[in-house]
């Protein structure tokens, strides 16, 4: 009987305690809610429509920070940058890249590679030194990896992010950003080295104009004609100066983005970003054609940059003026098989 009374008293006590708790808690919760609403109302009244209109207009307010533009809550120019980058440059850049890939693919299957008109003789002509080849492949590796990491930063969110786990996507994009930031200055150094090393071989002359008029002997009525050329033909010189000019623009704008410690404002960074992206896209499209010619578009086109020398027939047909200059040099004489 005593146990039953204890259970009954406990069952009655618990609801009473709960009611008392709610009685004291509800006013407190209500007060908190009222205080929050009061604070929100006060903030709205303090800000007002005029305040937020000024914020949206990009007007600068007061702040204790002495850094430039720290008093600006909303950068109106940032919206313009976003639209130009995401709505125009990104899709047009993708179209240009895929268009370039489509063009070289079409060229391969319709025009085909440029073949040698005569058999190889086996006589080797020295063309590129070890230093030249090391510089070329260093630049090639740096450029291609920067292009890949840059494309990941611009287009990865459209193609990779939807199919990858969040953690893996985060690691990839972080690695791409860090690699791009640290490798960019190295690209600039290599670019200056390339300019100093090869600019004399890349001065355009009338022979190159004729080369362009005949479209390098690769298409049309001049296909297979092998127009005259010195050490570098018109196409190689065009690629060289494309690399130098747009590479310099990409390197300088990248430096501005890499080191925002020289008083750059938001608009400086936004403009540098657009210029950097535009110049990089031009370089990528240009080097799609360069890579195509080296790998697929010309017979033995890659030999010289791999081994350092080329076959005599290739030298005669593609760089006849240069061949005439170097054919009698001691290093280009046929090797005595018995020696």
What is the role of each PLM region?
Residues 5, 27-339:
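Membrane-embedded alpha-helical bundles that constitute the cytochrome b-like, heme-associated redox core
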């Amino acid at each position: 009987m005593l146990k039953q009374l204890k259970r009954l008293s406990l069952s009655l006590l618990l609801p009473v305690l709960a009611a008392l708790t709610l009685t004291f808690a509800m006013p407190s919760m209500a007060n908190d809610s009222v205080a929050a609403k009061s604070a929100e109302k006060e903030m709205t009244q303090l800000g007002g429509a005029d305040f937020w209109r000024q914020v949206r207009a990009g007007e600068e307010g007061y702040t204790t920070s002495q850094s430039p533009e720290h008093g600006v809550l909303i950068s109106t120019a940032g919206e313009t940058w976003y639209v130009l980058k995401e709505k125009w440059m990104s899709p047009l850049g993708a179209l240009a890249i895929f268009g370039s890939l489509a063009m070289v693919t079409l060229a391969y299957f319709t025009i085909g590679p440029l073949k040698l008109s005569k058999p190889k003789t086996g006589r080797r002509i020295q063309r590129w030194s070890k230093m030249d080849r090391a510089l070329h492949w260093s630049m090639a590796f740096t450029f291609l990896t920067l292009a890949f990491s840059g494309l990941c930063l611009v287009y990865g969110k459209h193609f990779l992010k939807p199919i990858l786990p969040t953690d893996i996507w985060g690691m990839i994009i972080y690695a791409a950003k860090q690699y791009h930031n640290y490798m960019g200055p190295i690209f600039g150094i290599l670019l200056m080295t390339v300019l100093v090393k090869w600019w004399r071989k890349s001065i355009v002359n009338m022979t190159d104009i004729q080369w362009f008029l005949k479209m390098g002997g690769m298409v049309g009525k001049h296909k297979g004609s092998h127009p005259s050329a010195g050490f570098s033909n018109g196409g190689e010189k065009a690629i060289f100066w494309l690399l130098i000019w747009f590479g310099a623009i990409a390197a300088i704008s990248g430096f501005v983005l890499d080191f925002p410690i020289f008083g750059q404002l938001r608009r400086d960074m936004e403009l540098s970003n657009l210029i950097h992206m535009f110049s990089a896209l031009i370089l990528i499209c240009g080097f799609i054609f360069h890579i195509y010619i080296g790998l697929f578009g010309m017979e033995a086109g890659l030999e010289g940059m791999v081994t350092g020398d080329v076959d005599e027939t290739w030298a005669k047909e593609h760089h006849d003026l240069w061949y005439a200059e170097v054919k009698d040099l001691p290093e280009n004489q046929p090797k005595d098989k018995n020696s």
